[in-house]
Structure formats: structure tokens, C-alpha cells
Amino acid sequence: MNTKIIVSAFLLAGLLSACEKDTPAVSAAPQETATVEEPAATPLEAETPSRFDIYAEVGLTTDLSHLSDNQRKMIGLLIDAGKITDDIFWQQVWGDKDELLDGIEDTKMRRFAMYNYGPWDRLAADQPFIESYGPRPPGARFYPEDMSKQEFETWQQDGKNEQYSIVKRDSDGGLVLVPYSKAFSSQINAIAELLIEASALADDEEFAAYLKLRAEALKTDNYQASDMAWMDMKNNPIELVIGPIETYQDALFGYRAAFETFVLIKDQAWSERLARFAKYMPELQKGLPVDDAYKAEMPGSDADLNAYDLAYCAGDCNSGSKTIAINLPNDEEVQLAKGTRRLQIKNSMLAKFNQILTPIASELIAEDQRQHITFDAFFGNTMFHEVAHGLGIKTTLDGAGTVRQAMKEHASALEEGKADILGLYMVQKLRENGEITEGELMDNYVTFLAGIFRSIRFGASSAHGRANMIRFNYFSDAGAFTRDPDNGTYRVNVAEFEQAIKDLGNDLLVLQGNGDYDAVAAFVAEKGNVSAQLQADLNRLDAISIPVDIVYQQGKEQLGL
């Protein structure tokens, strides 16, 4: 590689950084089914260096004063483990980090490459921002770059669709599976040692047991026992998510999981506000707006909802758009047995609300409806999005396998869209039952609409971005909102908005349950695009320098450790 990389061209600052893992920062490469109606194949242009400034910096701090000395030491070890997962993630999506960064002389460009974990802009449909690079490989580094879909699909190999291996070529040019535990053996052994060391400092026995099981899972590529233990762990004030978790980065098939780490501190007061909602999961599942066949699976009712402050993140969740809520584990068997844990990341959420969502609403939401933009509604919509991941259908009706496997690269976008819509359905039902009394339902609707504009800016390379493109177009066709041509602001039409929630919820659940890949691809192709009018409105946000997302100043020093 050249020792000096020059800045390539940047498209106009108004280029759609388009339509979030917000739930997990994601980067599936653009498919033919998710398009932006703008010229989109040229590298980004240097005339607008402000493209390098689309992220607002946020310091990750939280109160650790209530933790013991051992717990504070343990956090330091967990951060050390997280740094290693960051190194693995670089290898999964790019390769040699130092070779790339050392060759970039421009300071802002180098920083932008660090934010994106490579030379592709994750919030602009993965366009290259360095002129010597072409398109991002859809399969990242999970597969040989010269491997076609057909070659993989005709390959007779057990376990080829599993999450915890990479595909390489052997000396004869054939395909071979390499488990993560072997592909990244030195890093994984180092992480496991740190987790074992941290377990000795844990005040909570269940957390100590989880750390040991997670260390073993990393070394064996078998995560189910540790996922079960994680769900059984209820009382520890420190939370850790570590390992290969989400499959967004595999845009070729959506099979392979990328490494990441979250270190979080529980907000006990806010968590107590949320605890009562988990028990309603079975009742809400029964009431879903879809035929009974698509809601026959019953989620666990011992799932828990908690609020946290993020202390550190690394790897997948630190790339591109930042996660503000987590719903795990992803293992369908664990979900049915134990439910899921929903982690609301309060400090990240508040930063996005103040720095991004509120300014967007001031520009694009009708003035007389802006009073309905509230943090409680933003928090609630996000929380119930995560809860809604546990609702619906996990296995196709024909029994052929999981929805995730049937939908392939469209699985993430469809699942994120389902969670958004069913989350709003849950808000409706819980308000009707008197379980949610803060604010009013209109707050959730208007804040939800503003949130669509926020998430569309994550781009076609984001599962959340594509999900929001689909929803915007579906809602527009249904008359759920109206755009005022005189001032370019949008207004929620309540009756049509509520009907669109029911209709889209039904459509997404049916698509998932039927497991019809071609039907899903056609649906995403029809709805997953940005019109010229929407693009022009998004350009207005760029013109007044509203950040697209946030980046973290983080680490032990930031936390005072």
C-alpha cells in the first residue's frame, strides 16, 4: 500500500448518510434492494471536509462511587478485554488496522477511518472516502473476497451457515471453515484470561460464574450455556456483553457474528421504573395484529428491562452509528426458554436526543406538534423496540429453520422494522391498560416520526437505516403523515398513523413467518429507497450541521480509573 493516502472526493455534504444495531451500530453493504435515488458510486469529495465532522463527540462518564474497590478494578480488566475484541473486529471487517491508519496523513481522515473501521463511510451507504479503495466487500473478511454466493451455496459443508467461523481457501483453492477460536486463538485466549481474572474480583457470585462460562464459550465457540447464565444473572450492578454477537456486518448472507464489547453500569432508579413491563410479554404476544399461526410461539415472561450508563464499548457496537439499546441473547432457544434482556443505554440515548433528535424536530416537524417531542417518549419508544424483538415469530411456519436463516441478508432490516412497529403497538396497548401514564400517546407518535428521520440518515448500509426507509415509504403511502409544501415540515395524522402501525406489523410478521426470501427481497426493493423529496429534506439537516451520530471519548482515564 502507498505510504501516503490522499483524500478522495466527498459528495455534497447533503449526501444521504442515510438511513442504526441504533441498535447496534451496523454496516451491511448496500444491496440492490436498498437504494438511494441519487448518483451513488463515486468516492466522497474533499470539497466538503465537514463530512469528516458528522459525528458529535461525547465523553463517556458515569458515577462509579457506589462500587467497591474490587468492582472498579474489575471494570478496568473488562475494558482491557474489550480492547482485544476491538482488534478482532478490525480483522473481521478490514484487516491490518495499522497499515491503513499509518498511511493516512490527513488527521481528520485518519480519525474518520477509525470511526468507520476502514475506508468506507458507514453512514453513506459504505461509499469509499479514500480514492484508492473500491466498494466494500459484502462479506467483509468473513469469506474469501473472490467467493461467489453460488460457490458458497453449492458447497457441501456441515455448519457452513453457523455464526462463529470464517470461510477461507485451502492450499488447493477450495473452501474451508475455520472456527473463531482457531482463527483468532491468541486474542481469544487473552480475553478468556482477563475474564477469569475479573471473575475473582466479582462481588456477585452469578456474575463471577457468567464470566467463567463466557471465557469457556470463547474458547469453544459454544455460547449457549453462557447465554443462559447471563439471563439468570439479575443483581450485579455491572453488566458485560462480550464476544461475537450481531450478524449485521455479514451483508453477503447475514450468518456470521462480529466481535464487540459493552461495559455498562446499572441505573437502579430507572431500572425499577421499567421492571414491571416484562410480565406482559405473553399477553402482548397473544394480541399481536396478525393471524394466530404467526404468534403461536410464546416468549419467556422472566425477561428483564433495565437502564444503564455505558462505560465503554468496542468493536461492532463502536463502529458507525452508536447503539442506544440492546436486546439479547440472539439465540432463539435461549429466548424461548428465558426470554431476553433489554438494556436501555440512558447516557447515550440522552446525548442523541439533545444533540440530534431535538434539532431535527425543530427543522422537520410541524411547529404545533413539536411540543410532543419528549425524552420520555424517545426512551419509551426505544425501550419497547427492544422488548418487541422478543415478540413475533422465530421459526418459519414450514418448520424449515429460523427466520434469520430464511431471510439471509434481509433478516436484520426486517427484524429491526418489526421491532420498531411492534414496539409502538406495545406502547398503545400499555397506555390503554393504564400501565404507562407519563405523557400522552401523541408524544410517542410524533417522537417516533422524528426518529425516522434520525435513523434514515444511517444509510442503506445500516439495518436500522433500511428499516426506517421502508417504514417512511409505507407510512407515506398510508397517509400516516402529511408534508406541508410551504414550509417543508411533517405532521402526524393520528387515525392513519395508527392503522399503518397495524398493517405494517401484520405484513412484517407474515413475511417473516412465511420465510419467503423472494417476497422479502421484492418488498425491500419496493420500499427501501429514498425519494428525491425526502433526500432534499435530509439535505437541510446537513446544511445546518446537525450531527448524524455520536462518537465516544472513552476509557479508564475518562472514568477516573
Locations of regions flagged by a protein language model:
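Active-site recognition of the HExxH zinc-binding catalytic motif
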Residues: 68, 377-394, 419, 424
